Amino acid sequence: MTSSLALVLVFGGAAVCAELALRGGYRERSNQDDPEYLELAHYATSTWSAQQPGKTHFDTVVEVLKVETQTVAGTNYRLTLKVAESTCELTSTYNKDTCQANANAAQRTCTTVIYRNLQGEKSISSFECAAA
């Protein structure tokens, strides 16, 4: 009886520790084509590119490569994207359906973190790119 209780305590404690390790960390999602993630990807890419000095065209999302989420007081979305300069000038309004990647534009791999609070308001926490 004592050894059974000890085993329950050991395995129960291990399960609690594993659960605590997951809390607060990012969890990978398998559905990169989910409309919510695509909307966030386009929001971050178009907003970020519009703020870059010297740019004349919006960047657009070519592909969502990876999605991770983290529950905080709201949700952090860490997205890894393939982006390229679009055919839409910054003087126009960005539209994900009409702002297609420029055929001659180099593609870059970017990672962005978007925070969405409990009221649904979103903001870009970071956006970093490297050559693809």
Swiss-Prot record:
**Keyword annotations:** Disulfide bond, Protease inhibitor, Secreted, Signal, Thiol protease inhibitor
Q: Which SMART domains match?
A: CY
Phenotype upon loss of function = Combined, RNAi-mediated down-regulation of salivary cystatin-L and salivary cystatin-L2 in salivary glands strongly impairs the tick's ability to feed on hosts. About 40% of the ticks cannot feed and die. The remainder show much reduced blood intake, appear unhealthy and display strongly reduced egg laying. RNAi-treated ticks show an impaired ability to suppress the host's immune response to tick salivary proteins.
GO CC, one annotated term? extracellular space
Location(s) in or outside the cell: Secreted
> Per UniProt, what is one GO molecular function of this protein?
cysteine-type endopeptidase inhibitor activity
Chain residue ranges for the region called Required for interaction with mouse ANXA2: 87-131
Any coiled-coil regions, as ranges: none
- Principal subcellular localisation of the protein: secreted
SUPFAM superfamilies, per the entry: Cystatin/monellin
- Pfam families noted in UniProt: Cystatin
Q: Which family does this protein fall into? A: Belongs to the cystatin family.
Q: What is this protein called?
A: Salivary cystatin-L2
Q: Which organism is it from?
A: Ixodes scapularis
